[in-house]
């Protein structure tokens, strides 16, 4: 094997936690190598050591057979290591050219920025990737996939020979993900080694050559993709066999009351009018392609965005829900798609995040907060949803994705909501934590909560939902239930609409 990268006996501890213990990893030139493990397994810490962000307590890094010590990120970049983080590091108001050369602008002989040379170099990089990017458009106007390609281009502009891709498909459509895989294969052909981190195990079998699995900061195994399967990988990642991620679906009472009835919702003046109902104890799925109107519908219902026409009832009573505060008073909460930026204040503690929407509940005097009462409630809801953390004072930014999602759920339970909207609830969450979130959702419906679940993952729509409203171009094309909920039927309505359909929207 033509080894370009060798990590040997890497060990790293933080106060009270041994994050990595004696980890070995070898990557070949031109190899796409998957790094798998649950959140908290040590993947991020290992990659931060490779990037010079953390220094190991013990162990060595070799690139092309030469020992390396990275005092900081710039040392790693100089050695040919590049990383594309899950959360982009682009400047939104700058164009692709300026983002690629930010802080290292090319200069002409008079010392002025040489825009022409930088633009030509950027064009050559994107031609190497085989992607079309408007070089003069502000980054904020590009699609998420195009921004991803700019991040990859930035790494290549720094002559990266080892490229780390951290959850690169998390916000991409299937078609965009396929485009990314094509780019990865081209880079592989050019000899670039890639470390691919993903919670989507099916992607591993599409694009990777070998896999290394970590668990609880320890090395488990390295195997060729052709010699393993999903079940074996899951067992290596979680240390046990997961029979099924999805809890059994209950039989809903025929007379289960409707807790939310949308009699008419028209977002645009000339747009379709949608109608649907949500019953107590039910999980209603919103399925469809990206941009089909699922999230837009949910946001319009709670008043986060305006609608041309909106007629709805909450537990039988007409409600306006002019804004999210109205929705909250009516007992409706939302777990947004971007939990880190829209659902949490990550620099706050668990306690402060859970109390955020309900501080009045703990007011002991006009301006004072009953911290003891707040702590008791926080401990209670953390226990109910299964948040795993050292204390209620733990900063949310340090939690895994699954535990962060549970903190958002705990906040809404603390506010006595009865309707919860889960928008992409398992995005960026590992396989074990997904099963916990699914189980928690079913526990909530068993206690009388009603849930709208928006998801781009077809297996969880099929496995979790009692009924499914399928969206296409802003319209609910059909509402499926029971045996009608299968992948083929959902995709037929999502892509082809009601041509030849037998189901009516609910």
Curated annotation (Swiss-Prot):
Q: Which SMART domains match?
A: AAA
The listed locations are: Cell inner membrane
According to the UniProt entry, where is the signal peptide? none
GO MF annotation: an example = ABC-type D-ribose transporter activity
Listed GO cellular component terms? plasma membrane
Q: Which InterPro entries match?
A: AAA+_ATPase (IPR003593), ABC_carbohydrate_import_ATPase (IPR050107), ABC_transporter-like_ATP-bd (IPR003439), ABC_transporter-like_CS (IPR017871), P-loop_NTPase (IPR027417)
Task: Outline the extent of the ABC transporter domain.
Answer: 5-241, 254-498
EC assignment? 7.5.2.7
Q: How would you describe this protein's topology in the membrane?
A: Peripheral membrane protein
- Tell me yes or no: is DNA damage among this UniProt entry's keywords: no
Cite the entry's keywords alphabetically.
Answer: ATP-binding, Cell inner membrane, Cell membrane, Membrane, Nucleotide-binding, Repeat, Sugar transport, Translocase, Transport
Say yes or no: keyword Plastid present. Answer: no
Question: PROSITE patterns annotated for this entry?
Answer: ABC_TRANSPORTER_1, ABC_TRANSPORTER_2, RBSA
Q: Where, in this chain's numbering, is ATP bound?
A: 37-44
Q: Which family does it belong to?
A: Belongs to the ABC transporter superfamily. Ribose importer (TC 3.A.1.2.1) family.
Q: How does it assemble?
A: The complex is composed of an ATP-binding protein (RbsA), two transmembrane proteins (RbsC) and a solute-binding protein (RbsB).
Any idea what this protein is called? Ribose import ATP-binding protein RbsA 2
Organism whose genome encodes this protein? Burkholderia cenocepacia (strain HI2424)
